[in-house]
Design a protein with these regions (language model features):
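Short, charged surface segments at domain edges that flank catalytic/cofactor-binding sites
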Residues: 1-67, 90-92, 138-159
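Short, well-ordered alpha-helical packing segments
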Residues: 48, 52, 56, 63, ...
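Histidine-centered nuclease catalytic patch
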Residues: 64-99, 108-115
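Domain-exit/linker segments immediately C-terminal to small folded modules
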Residues: 94-167
């Protein structure tokens, strides 16, 4: 943070304030649902709710909508998914996560979305990019879109960025 200019630090403070407001809204929305654990939602529940809100409750890989019970029910069908596999990027940040139907997540495996779909199913790849482009603009859609459309060799550059941020 010391390397950043005053303007950059102010911008980051504003982003952090906006994120906290979104987290408070998510907590309030979760408490409206008749689920005992939502009286005091866990951070993982809040994150899932934010990811669902960001994606407009739609799986980017299948384009199918999902609901609260698909995410939080006794037998959830939707999981938190690392866009760039965590094993390849070491990135467990919010920006590298989305919600996806379990079946699509399993099929994607340890590949980037581009590696998985670009060559094998261009139509599905284009649909996915369309879904991600339509994510809620209150979130950092551009940065997420970059991860969804990343070239085969790009995860290494992400790892370098991540490492530099941590130093």
């Amino acid at each position: 943070d010391l390397k950043k200019s005053k303007k950059e630090r102010q911008k980051q403070t504003e982003i952090n304030r906006d994120r906290e407001k979104l987290r408070q809204e998510a907590t309030g929305e979760l408490r409206k649902h008749d689920v005992v654990r939502f009286a005091n939602p866990r951070n993982s529940d809040i994150e899932k709710y934010l990811l669902a809100t960001e994606a407009r409750w739609q799986c980017p890989y299948t384009s199918k909508k999902y609901g609260v019970t698909d995410v939080f029910g006794d037998h959830p069908q939707v999981d938190v998914e690392h866009i760039i596999p965590r094993s390849r990027s070491l990135d467990d940040s919010y920006l590298n996560k989305t919600l996806a139907y379990r079946s699509a997540n399993m099929e994607k495996g340890n590949r980037t979305p581009r590696e998985w779909l670009f060559e094998s199913d261009q139509e599905q790849y284009d649909r996915m990019i369309g879904v991600v482009s339509g994510f809620d603009p209150r979130f950092e859609v551009g940065k997420k879109l970059r991860r969804f459309s990343m070239e085969l060799s790009d995860p290494d550059s992400l790892l370098k960025e991540f490492t530099e941020r941590q130093l």
